[in-house]
C-alpha cells in the first residue's frame, strides 16, 4: 500500500512539474510571436495617399532606411501641387502593383533626378507606372523618369512623359550602372539632351 502511495505522490509531483514548465514556456512563445509580428510590420510600408509617399521620401533621406523593407503602392496617386521632389535613395523592394503615379514634376535645380534619385544595388522596383516630367534646371545631368541612377532592378515599369537634361538622360533611367538591370520597361513620350541620351537609359 505504501508503494502505491509513493508512486501516486511521484506521479502527482511529475505532473505538477510539467504544469509549471508549460506555464513558464507559453508566455515566451507569445512574446516571440508578438516580436515576429512587430518585425514584419516594421519591414513593410504601405502607400495609399500622397502624404504616405511624402513620408516615404522623407524617410529615404537616410540611405539605410529602406534596406530589407518592402513598400507597397496600394492606390493610384496624383502629385500635382504636392511638392514631391523624388525619393532620395532606395534600397528595398517597391511593389507598384500596377498602379499609376501621375503629375510628377521634377523641375528644380540639380543632377541625378528621377522619381527615385538613386536605386541602390540589390533594390527592386516592379510594376510601376509614372506620368509626368523630369526636367531639372542647372547642371541637368543624369536624368530619368523612373530613376536618375540605377544599380538595382527595374522590372515592368513604364514612364509616360518628358525627360530632359544636358547629358545622360533616359526615359527610364539616366544612368544604368554595371549592377543595374532594366527589364520589360517602356517609355512613351520624349527624351531631350545634348549628350548620352536614350529611350530607356542615357548610358
Per-range role (PLM):
Residues 14-27:
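Bacterial N-terminal signal peptides
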Residues 2-15:
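Bacterial N-terminal signal peptides that target proteins for export
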Residues 29-203:
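Surface-exposed repetitive/solenoidal architectures
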Amino acid at each position: 500500500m505504501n508503494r502505491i502511495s509513493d508512486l501516486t505522490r511521484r506521479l502527482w509531483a511529475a505532473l505538477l512539474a510539467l504544469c509549471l514548465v508549460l506555464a513558464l514556456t507559453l508566455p515566451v512563445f507569445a512574446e516571440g510571436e508578438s516580436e515576429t509580428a512587430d518585425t514584419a510590420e516594421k519591414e513593410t510600408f504601405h502607400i495609399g495617399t500622397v502624404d504616405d509617399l511624402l513620408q516615404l521620401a522623407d524617410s529615404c533621406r537616410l540611405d539605410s532606411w529602406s534596406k530589407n523593407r518592402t513598400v507597397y503602392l496600394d492606390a493610384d496617386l496624383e502629385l500635382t501641387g504636392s511638392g514631391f521632389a523624388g525619393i532620395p535613395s532606395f534600397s528595398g523592394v517597391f511593389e507598384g502593383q500596377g498602379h499609376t503615379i501621375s503629375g510628377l514634376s521634377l523641375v528644380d535645380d540639380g543632377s541625378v533626378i528621377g522619381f527615385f534619385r538613386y536605386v541602390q544595388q540589390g533594390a527592386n522596383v516592379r510594376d510601376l507606372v509614372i506620368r509626368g516630367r523630369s526636367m531639372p534646371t542647372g547642371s541637368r545631368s543624369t536624368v530619368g523618369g523612373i530613376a536618375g541612377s540605377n544599380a538595382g532592378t527595374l522590372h515592368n515599369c513604364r514612364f509616360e512623359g518628358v525627360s530632359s537634361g544636358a547629358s545622360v538622360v533616359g526615359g527610364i533611367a539616366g544612368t544604368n550602372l554595371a549592377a543595374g538591370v532594366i527589364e520589360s520597361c517602356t517609355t512613351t513620350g520624349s527624351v531631350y539632351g545634348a549628350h548620352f541620351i536614350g529611350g530607356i537609359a542615357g548610358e
